[in-house]
């Protein structure tokens, strides 16, 4: 854990990180010629994706699984260009962004062997590790370390006078942790930040707090340079478009927009918004309002205001945003009008260069959902990161792969999330897969002990995995290069309990999930 200096310096809290901590240290580094910015919005607590992005085409199954919290079908907001799927009625702001061609929802994002602990699952998402691997650096931190390999020596400088990453409020997270040092700084109010690092010349006692104070002083000269440019950037912007009041996420995003317009070259901004651990009282009696509706409404309004503001400020060409939460919720609601920790869930991308619409299909919902049923993964979250690194930050594919653990990088997809022009060579969207385009099937289905899984590949790297309803990876049937064609592989379920299983097929930028039922 990052160690904080508990005292206040001249009345201001200064956050310094113990240099021996696995989460520690200071700022960032530049190579690739791009002025692009990524804004990461963390939804803390585990957001209920099924009540945020609602599978209207499978409404009867959705309703049967969630009778006490299901959003009324006639209240679901349609999404421009998408059929059979809608948004929670509180998300009118995001609905407008879809209509403007500036929002995308990626369905069922997750990873094999999901972890249901808030802390561990958050670490997995921030580090891009696998479920059973501890990685003490963040995916964005490793990217920044690649771009600025000599930091902190010689920074700030004329080429990069600004912080490489900024987190608004709280601690700098694992996301921004580089291999040896933290690549981000945390600020609360940019107009007063200059004051936060001044007046630190009192005697430092020989205590843990005193050592932290000495560390603050050691980085003071460097931080002083960043404080100056942050203050100048904030003061350079005097007019912004309106933001909702009483909305802490909107307050954070307003600062981000101000700093971007003010001229900072900062590559990554991170903001957070909590309260999504909705085990109980998620909805009111009308199902449309309640604690979850309030959260989603604030997220939607904040992102819409931010997007309007960066357009007003003339910087929207440079900015891409994404949301994430450490996990989704179970398919079936609980008896407390809430939902319990689950696996895969949708996430949003927003910005002028987003390929608007929906990537993926509605999640598979069992006709008679059980308490342990989870949304099966369609997209690995690390493929979202890889796409951003290659198609937004313009990195070579080999560099992107080097930023992920070796057992993951060969399975990364570059997804059709961004419009051509963000970087050269953006992958065009694949042709839509209809219900009749079954790329993966199995027979017999239901089956007792063995079933044959048939898949049709367009050629190239092909992955076929089997998951259970908890999202655990049971086996990998194949993970290799193929020539185009149709192939069959037997799946032997000997020793596995009866129940629902999912075959996940991945080929290039295409994937499908097939539900398979084992009976006694």
Where do the language-model regions lie?
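Feature for exported/extracytoplasmic and membrane-associated proteins, marking the mature portion
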Residues: 1-301, 305-313, 332, 346-423
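C-terminal outer-membrane/trafficking sorting elements
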Residues: 432-443, 447-520
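Short, glycine/acidic-enriched loop or turn micro-motifs at the edges of active sites
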Residues: 45, 280, 329, 448, ...
């Amino acid at each position: 854990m990052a160690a904080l200096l508990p005292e206040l310096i001249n009345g201001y809290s200064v956050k310094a990180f113990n240099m021996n901590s696995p989460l520690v240290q200071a700022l960032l580094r530049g190579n690739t010629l791009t002025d692009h910015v990524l804004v990461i919005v963390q939804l803390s607590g585990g957001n209920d994706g099924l009540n945020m992005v609602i599978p209207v085409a499978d409404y009867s199954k959705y309703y049967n699984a969630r009778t006490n919290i299901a959003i009324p079908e006639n209240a679901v907001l349609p999404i421009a260009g998408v059929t059979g799927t809608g948004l929670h009625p509180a998300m009118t702001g995001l609905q407008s962004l879809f209509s403007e061609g500036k929002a995308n929802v990626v369905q069922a994002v997750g990873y094999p062997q999901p972890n249901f602990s808030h802390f561990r699952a958050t670490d997995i998402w921030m580090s891009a590790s696998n479920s059973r691997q501890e990685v003490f650096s963040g995916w964005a931190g490793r990217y920044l370390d690649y771009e600025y390999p000599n930091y902190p020596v010689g920074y700030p400088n004329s080429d990069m006078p600004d912080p490489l990453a900024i987190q608004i409020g709280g601690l700098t997270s694992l996301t921004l942790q580089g291999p040896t040092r933290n690549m981000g700084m945390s600020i609360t109010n940019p107009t007063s930040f200059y004051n936060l690092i001044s007046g630190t010349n009192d005697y430092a006692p020989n205590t843990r707090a005193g050592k932290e104070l000495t560390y603050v002083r050691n980085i003071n000269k460097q931080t002083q340079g960043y404080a100056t440019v942050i203050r100048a950037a904030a003061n350079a912007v005097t007019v912004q478009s309106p933001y909702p009041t009483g909305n802490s996420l909107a307050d954070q995003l307003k600062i981000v927009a101000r700093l971007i317009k003010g001229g900072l070259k900062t590559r990554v901004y991170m903001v957070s918004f909590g309260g999504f651990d909705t085990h109980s009282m998620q909805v009111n009696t009308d199902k449309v309002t309640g604690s979850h509706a309030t959260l989603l409404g604030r997220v939607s309004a904040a992102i819409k205001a931010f997007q309007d503001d960066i357009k007003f400020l003339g910087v929207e060409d440079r900015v891409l945003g994404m949301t994430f939460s450490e996990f989704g919720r179970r398919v079936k609601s609980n008896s407390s009008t809430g939902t319990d920790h689950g696996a895969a869930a949708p996430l949003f991308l927003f910005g002028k260069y987003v390929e608007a619409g929906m990537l993926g299909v509605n999640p598979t919902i069992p006709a008679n959902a059980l308490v342990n049923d989870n949304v099966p993964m369609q997209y690995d979250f690390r493929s979202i990161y890889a796409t951003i690194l290659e198609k937004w930050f313009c990195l070579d594919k080999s560099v992107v792969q080097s930023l992920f653990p070796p057992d993951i990088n060969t399975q990364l997809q570059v997804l059709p999330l961004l419009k051509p022009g963000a970087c050269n060579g953006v992958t065009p969207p694949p042709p839509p897969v209809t219900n009749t385009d079954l790329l993966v099937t199995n027979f017999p289905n239901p089956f007792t002990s063995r079933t044959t899984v048939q898949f049709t590949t367009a050629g190239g790297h092909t992955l076929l995995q089997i998951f259970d309803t908890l999202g655990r990876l049971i086996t990998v049937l194949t993970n290799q290069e193929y020539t185009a064609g149709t192939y069959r592989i037997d799946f032997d379920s000997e020793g596995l309990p009866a129940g629902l299983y999912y075959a996940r097929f991945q080929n290039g930028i295409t994937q499908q999930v097939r539900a398979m039922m084992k009976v006694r």
